Swiss-Prot record:
InterPro entries according to UniProt: UDG_fam1, Ura-DNA_Glyclase_AS, Uracil-DNA_glycosylase-like, Uracil-DNA_glycosylase-like_sf
Chief localisation class: cytoplasm
Sequence segments annotated as region (Disordered): 228-250
SUPFAM superfamilies: Uracil-DNA glycosylase-like
Native source organism of the sequence: Bordetella parapertussis (strain 12822 / ATCC BAA-587 / NCTC 13253)
Active site: D78 (proton acceptor)
Name the UniProt record assigns to this protein: Uracil-DNA glycosylase
One Pfam family per UniProt: UDG
GO MF assignments: uracil DNA N-glycosylase activity
GO CC annotation terms, alphabetical: cytoplasm
Length: 250
């Protein structure tokens, strides 16, 4: 049986209210509050009508990280729309789920320079300051993009802008046109690094202008962070294995 990752009625509002203050104040900005109220109304209406909505924890990407804790931002589009998949972290699925094609290509790219990840759950990245944020935080079963343009983009744009305003150095990994459209939210003089490539989906990963395959983003991210006195990210997700830490430095 797949994990039960269905959103429960009233859970979205409760989770928003429980967010850390650094994120909650973003949702309280007037324009963002109006957009979130619109999203919330639509989600609750669809749940009342019997729709299955994923994931159970839409705000999970924000739970363990304040804006100042974020070192890398990876943007997705909307959650996986199959049962048991979406976890509230972009690209991540439970370990017992089959590895989705885009995540497989991400792992292939990591394996060029580092040990290949063995876990499909990317929580270990989050614990190292990697924000895995979808631009739409809910989706209906079997209907990709079903909650896009319902107000989520206003909410997540404000969250991205809040991260970009924080002065600590950050890397923004923008894969595909949808993510790259968010580059305008990252001021050019903010001292952050923006790396862009095609989406890791098999449909686009090898296409020009900047193929995802061979982009070297994970190596470049670590090199840039280390140049600024920060620890590299253990992209293998096995940061507790001290004997392998040196493999993630350049």
């Amino acid at each position: 049986m797949p994990n039960d990752n269905r959103l429960a009625p009233a859970a979205l509002a409760a989770q928003a209210a429980a967010l850390p203050a650094a994120w909650r104040h973003v949702l309280e900005q007037p324009a963002v509050a109006r957009a979130f109220a619109s999203v919330l109304g639509h989600v609750e209406q669809r749940l009342a009508e019997g729709a299955v909505v994923y994931p159970a924890t839409p705000f999970r990407a924000l739970d363990q990280l304040a804006p100042a804790d974020v070192r890398v931002v990876i943007l997705g589009q909307d959650p996986y729309h199959g049962p048991g998949q979406a976890q509230g972290l972009a690209f991540s699925v439970p370990d017992d789920c089959k590895c989705p094609p885009s995540l497989r290509n991400i792992f292939n790219e990591i394996a060029v320079d580092y040990p290949r990840p063995t876990r499909h759950d990317l929580s270990a990245w989050t614990r190292q300051g990697v924000l895995l944020l979808n631009t739409s935080l809910t989706v209906e079963d079997g209907q990709p993009g079903s909650h896009a343009k319902r107000g989520w983009e206003t909410v997540t744009d404000a969250l991205i802008a809040e991260v970009a305003r924080d002065p600590s150095p950050k890397v923004f990994l923008l894969w595909g046109a949808h993510a790259q459209a968010k580059q305008a939210l990252v001021p050019a003089d903010a001292g952050h690094l923006v790396l862009a490539a095609n989406h890791p989906s098999p449909l686009s990963a090898r296409r020009p202008p900047v193929p995802f395959v061979g982009c070297g983003h994970f190596r470049q991210t670590n090199a840039w962070l280390q140049q600024r006195g920060q620890k590299p990210v253990d992209w293998s997700g096995e940061q507790n294995n001290a004997s392998r830490q040196g493999e993630f430095a350049l």
